[in-house]
Amino acid sequence: SPPMRRRARIDGNHVAIVQTLRDLGVSVFSTAGVGDGFPDLVCGYHGTHLLELKDGSLSPSRRRLTDDEREWHEAWLGEPVEVVESPAQAAELVEYWDRLEVSKTET
């Protein structure tokens, strides 16, 4: 029989982070249901970004990447997966993407 797929867990702040990103003009596709270590969000904003969501209100041990997530992130050859723990951190990430884009156009 095929190996059991590990069920994906949706973090409590998922909806709020997605809404924050969309409010800031980011295209967001939730991949939280994919499981097996795949990141929670695929975002389009000055390129494509993969986000892993963790609930910042949980203890650090409960926010750690799972073995599946860590293996997936390490094997991924594209832009590094960003770990986001709150809507505020998501907004900071969008500001960072804006600054990166500006610095690219200035060179």
Residues of each region from the PLM?
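Catalytic phosphate/metal-binding cores of nucleic-acid and nucleotide-processing enzymes, i.e., regions
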Residues: 1-107
